[in-house]
From Swiss-Prot:
It is found in: Secreted. It comes from Androctonus crassicauda. It comes from the Eukaryota. Signal peptide: none annotated. This is Putative sodium channel alpha-toxin Acra7. InterPro entries: LCN-type_CS_alpha_beta_dom, Scorpion_toxin-like, Scorpion_toxin-like_sf, Scorpion_toxinL, Scorpion_toxinL/defensin.
Amino acid sequence: VRDGYIVKPTNCVIHCIPFSPGCDKDCKEKGAASGYCQAFGKHGNGCWCIDLPDKVPIKDPNQDCTR
């Protein structure tokens, strides 16, 4: 398990609204312990998951977001 930004298949972070419950819900659906909206982070407002299973893709800093 690890922590990280959940991403779309294009390696773009899933954006969110700070303090909304959406990220916690999305992260838990993917098997994480919890999650929250990381506001004003390096990738904008993105969903950060805690204790996410290794099989779930997270933001790869070595790859660009391809929209």
